[in-house]
UniProtKB/Swiss-Prot annotation:
It catalyses: D-threonate + ATP = 4-O-phospho-D-threonate + ADP + H(+). ATP binds at residues 251, 345-348, 392. The keyword Thylakoid does not apply. Substrate binds at residues 9, 53, 81-84. InterPro entries: 4-carb_acid_sugar_kinase_N, 4-carb_acid_sugar_kinase_N_sf, NBD_C, NBD_C_sf. This is D-threonate kinase. One of its GO terms (molecular function) is kinase activity.
Length: 415
């Protein structure tokens, strides 16, 4: 059994695929069609980051279809990874994939991170998603009503309420199959606990109608748990070569800010906050060279470093990709001296890896829910690096510190 995961950002792709890696699957996350050093033909699970979150809906849908064809979607089980806080073009992408892949089993809940679904609407730590800081930061409007959002994209959708999800395997399977025969194209599933997701996974894994799954890391873990892969237990992590760890915080969520503060306080590592105005102007800004030299000097000396983006009155959520790309270019000379990267915010992680010419990640294990640990391919003249990625609004307050610990506890001494 092989899987194709299509995600709209890098941290989501890794977070979704880690469950399979933990079940022993050979799992690769790709940033490009043919990444150097990664043999996709030998992978049990290929997770494609199509980087479509900020695209126009039509362009995002086309990018997903391209990934489906390129990833041999017809011969693999498909998991369409979406953001558990419904950012991006998930509804348009799901509607585009449905004619090819079948009935959409939609369950974005991720209880381990406080994301749940009730009455077909999303909640974050018990609060309606539309009332959360996450939606305010992204300037999103309306209600987080999954059925309505799918219907707005022309997909006939219906709700599978919690009492049906908990009615038992046979009832759940028969209900979903019956809805498909009635012409329903998407089933939106309530879920409050990991047991609810496990029930959905078990009931839908053997449906007698074509189907694919639409969700976050929560449902992906539930689907991966009973899978048997030849690799068995995940391979132990080899000790990385000696060298510093660079932590990039490109997300401006309050959660990421608290995580960065925790990392700084517990490690005492050097930190740098880069004003957005420097990143907007790039190398032409008067302070660019000084900031770049500060980053490079610290990492060249073998010291770990925390770099984050500041905020100002001109902040616009839509400029995230631009700021992330500039942060990557600012950090690139120093990145060459690192052996580890921690990146919070999928756009930040992708920008840094792309700038460094890294097109794939081999997933290893999970630091905590939503924080996977990976290795980059070893290429001629380019040593492998350890990478931890995290969505901006995910994780415990100590998430970055836990990621740093996971990297440094086995770090080999510098030569």
């Amino acid at each position: 059994m092989s899987w194709l995961i299509i995600a709209d950002d890098l941290s989501g792709a890794a977070d979704c695929a880690i469950g399979y890696a933990m079940s022993g699957a050979r799992t690769v996350v790709t940033l490009e069609a043919a990444p150097a050093g990664a043999d996709l033909s030998q992978a049990d699970v290929v997770a494609c980051d199509v980087d479509s979150r900020r695209m126009a809906p039509q362009e995002a849908a086309a990018r997903n279809l391209e990934a489906w064809h390129r990833g041999q979607g017809a011969s693999r089980r498909l998991y369409k990874k979406i953001d558990s806080t419904l950012r991006g073009n998930w509804a348009a992408e799901t509607a585009a994939l449905a004619p090819l892949a079948g009935l959409a089993i939609v369950a974005p809940a991720f209880p381990a991170t406080g994301r749940t679904t009730a009455g077909g609407c999303m909640f974050v730590n018990g609060q309606p998603l539309e009332d959360s800081d996450i939606w305010r930061l992204e300037a999103l409007t309306g209600r987080a009503d999954l059925v309505a959002l799918l219907a707005a994209r022309g997909l006939r959708a219906t709700l599978l309420p919690l009492d049906t999800v908990r009615a038992g395997d046979a009832t759940l399977r028969l209900t979903i199959a019956g809805l498909a025969r009635e012409g329903v194209r998407a089933v939106v599933c309530d879920a409050q606990t990991e047991q609810d997701l496990a029930a959905l996974a078990a009931a839908t894994a053997q449906l007698d109608v074509p189907a694919f799954w639409v969700g976050s890391g929560g449902l992906a873990r539930a689907l991966a748990a009973p899978c048997l892969f030849e690799g068995g237990a995940p391979q132990p992590l080899p000790a990385p070569e000696g060298g510093p760890v660079l932590t990039l915080v490109g997300s401006l969520s309050g959660i990421s800010g608290r995580q960065a503060a925790c990392l700084r306080e517990r490690t005492g590592m050097q930190s740098l906050v880069v004003p957005p105005r420097i990143l907007r102007e790039g190398a032409g800004h008067a302070d660019w060279d000084a900031a770049q030299q500060s980053i490079t000097g610290c990492l060249r000396a073998g010291r770990d470093l925390l770099v984050s983006i500041g905020r100002d009155d001109a902040f616009d959520p839509g400029e995230g990709p631009r700021l992330s790309a500039a942060l990557a270019q600012l950090s690139l000379p120093g990145f060459q001296h690192t052996r580890g990267l921690i990146a919070t915010g999928g756009e930040t992680a992708r920008a840094m890896l792309s700038a460094a010419g890294i097109g794939a990640l081999m997933l290893r294990r999970e630091v905590e829910p939503g924080v996977p640990l990976s290795d980059t391919p070893a290429l001629p003249g380019v040593p492998a690096r350890r990478v931890a990625t995290k969505a901006g609004a995910f994780g415990s307050e100590a998430a970055l510190w836990h990621a740093w610990q996971a990297m440094t506890e086995s770090r080999a001494p510098s030569a």
